[in-house]
């Protein structure tokens, strides 16, 4: 990849991992595979349903890849929640990734959004119809305050994706625009609130810690994602409306200056995340730390982010940052590099095909009247 600032990326990544004291020990290998398969299996059966297949209209390979990516993110990061909660969150966040990759204009289906919502009618937009159907399965795990954050943040995410349809990076001089859009489509509040299921936390007792965690996670989670995504998005035509690129446009600065701005804010947020919760409820701190470490492991190990390419490029270099990065990468790979064949089975397309054949056979059964049944 030409012109990619490899040395700068290595230095930034190393500082981030050192600040959060990266040491992912969330699972044994057996536990990780068990949780991955449980969440994947439930989510795969959900998306194999005829209604989901018909309304989403997503290429089977893309849906499969999206599901595997999200299951990995949830299982690696939400290490403290139940397997059932992991599965329901995996379904919800897969819906968000499907929307993020969509290029359909939402305007026509959103004309009567509030009227339909108020009247209790099914939403005209197929994504909202499906997400609303699944939402009760997600919200049952959380108290009312966390649930409201999940609902509100999901609505913000939809609006953020709507804005991104225009491939608009902001007007020069509009300094607030990049962070506005990133907060809108980052799902930070949804992620921050979904770490506290009611079977583990009393949201009234831990209200102050939870509220602060939601506030801190909003930036930390999306900024880390932006840093870890910078390599894969660097020369991808589909990823030109990123926070870094929008900094360049709106702040009228160079790409290096924009990356440095993101770097400093991410590192500051990481320091805050560790410092603020260091003397708070140990269970809260443990949950946050497990999330941060698992979230980093997921980025380093998931093929979507292509960070293994950086590793292969620099593993023989003798610089301090290269050696530290490779050590962290190998540490992550030792716990998180699990082949999809070990847990992501059967494929969604196969499950959907079986369901479709079963429905055809059911439809072909002879109809018997009540009189014939009696006879």
UniProtKB/Swiss-Prot annotation:
Q: What class of enzyme is it?
A: lyase
GO MF entries: trichodiene synthase activity
Pfam families on file: TRI5
UniProt function note: TS is a member of the terpene cyclase group of enzymes. It catalyzes the isomerization and cyclization of farnesyl pyro-phosphate to form trichodiene, the first cyclic intermediate in the biosynthetic pathway for trichothecenes. It serves to branch trichothecene biosynthesis from the isoprenoid pathway.
* Similarity-based family: Belongs to the trichodiene synthase family.
Q: What other note does the entry give for this protein?
A: Trichothecenes are sesquiterpenoid toxins that act by inhibiting protein biosynthesis.
The molecule here is called Trichodiene synthase
Q: Which species is this record about? A: Fusarium cortaderiae
